[in-house]
Design a protein with these regions (language model features):
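Intrinsically disordered, low-complexity segments enriched in serine, threonine, and glycine
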Residues: 1-107
Length: 107
């Protein structure tokens, strides 16, 4: 689980091999209908609103049309403690962009 203080944008990177990967964050499903081979990865960036497949050679391809369309794949992660759920059959990295209007207090 993760704890977030304000609604936050994210970057989700899912590593192949995997077919139709889904990660649930706070009960919300982030799903892309795609097949990734070993060495490829999928990158969802909620801030830029992009969904890209990155090949072994680093070439990027937009796969925006492969996203699940019933729910927005760019929905920000809500504040609070959020459980992360996935089938455990693939690896992923989740980067949360916590933004503040004031700097953190330094003591």
């Amino acid at each position: 689980s993760i704890r977030i203080f304000t609604e936050a944008n994210f970057k989700l990177r899912i590593y192949g091999p995997v077919v139709n990967p889904q990660v649930g964050i706070g009960g919300y499903p982030y799903l892309v209908n795609i097949m990734l081979e070993k060495g490829e990865y999928l990158e969802i960036n909620s801030m830029k609103e992009t969904v890209e497949k990155v090949a072994v050679n680093g070439e990027r391809e937009s796969v925006f049309h492969n996203r699940a369309k019933k729910k927005s794949i760019f929905k920000k992660v809500p504040p609070g403690k959020q459980e992360i759920v996935w089938p455990g059959t693939f690896d992923f990295d989740l980067l949360i962009y916590e933004e503040r209007s004031e700097p953190k207090c330094q003591n």
